[in-house]
């Protein structure tokens, strides 16, 4: 069995509907049995991000807070992929 790959998907937008893009991304990811996706609307759950191998973001005017930016930067520097 292939190892599970945890993915953190941030899909949200203030000014338009993100549902279509979110669904299409999930369909693409679902083609890979080893991928497990956590889908969220912001960047603030750093503990979950740190558990993941990589993060995908599809957003419109949704930004991480300064604290989340710092934590995400450390996560990327430690090998996390975004």
Regions found by a protein language model. Name each.
Residues 1-53:
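Aromatic-Pro/Gly-enriched surface loop or interdomain linker
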Residues 10, 50-82:
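Short alpha-beta junction capping motif
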